[in-house]
Amino acid sequence: MVSRTGLVEAARGQRPLDLVIRGGLLLNVYTGEVYPADIGIYGDRIAIVDRDRRLGLQGRNEFQARGHIAVPGFIDTHVHIESTMVTPPHFARAVLPFGTTTVVIDPHEIGNVYGRAGIEYMLKASEGLPLRVYLTIPSSVPAVPGLETAGAVFEASDIAEMLTWPRVIGVAELMDYPGIIQQTPRMAAIAEAGLRAGKRLEGHAPLVGGRDLAAYLAAGV
């Protein structure tokens, strides 16, 4: 992690950049433009983007990007790493070369099999990777109470505790949307635990509309 002062000085040209990505094009996702630009890196941060290469950036190292387009890292906002049948480190190796730099995972599959220990494993196995991994805590463990044999049951109190863990940003897809709409005690408590913690509630309500959709949204999803 670089200091803020160092980053400012690098942007102003008062200290050398660590890396200059030179000769490529840049996709501006705000304006839709593609234009020539050199990119100056200091530490692990972008210090400066030199549109049209007017500033003649210099750095300790250079990467020649001619023929390439620089784009922001892709963010996959919902993924089940377990479905890929690989561990988080192997998943990172697979997706990083194609531009995905951040994922938000819902580990409800391993949670339904292995319970809290499964969520802890996913948290630890994704720590320190070059891929940024954020977690949401499964709201449906078991997925269909009374219809299946799951490895655990996550009540609101369990979810509330796991929401305090690092890199946890929300409650995963609230698949029991009838329970949310009807405000059953268990699902209402799970939603309230997420809201009380200041976290996002992720929706999952296929084909729901009208008053039911309005009620689902009114519940905080």
Where are the regions a protein language model picked out?
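Short beta-strand/loop segments at the ligand-binding rim of alpha/beta enzyme cores
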Residues: 69, 74, 194-203
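Divalent-metal coordination cores built from histidine and acidic residues
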Residues: 7-10, 89-198
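Short, intrinsically disordered, charge-balanced linker/junction segments flanking boundaries
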Residues: 214-221
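Histidine-rich, glycine-flanked metal-binding segment
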Residues: 2-72
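Divalent metal-coordination and catalytic microenvironments
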Residues: 24, 44, 67, 78, ...
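Short acidic loop-to-helix transition motifs that present clustered carboxylates
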Residues: 55, 207-211
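Di-metal (Zn2+ and/or Mg2+/Mn2+) metal-binding site signature of metallo-dependent hydrolases
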Residues: 68-91
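Short acidic active-site motifs
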Residues: 158, 211-212
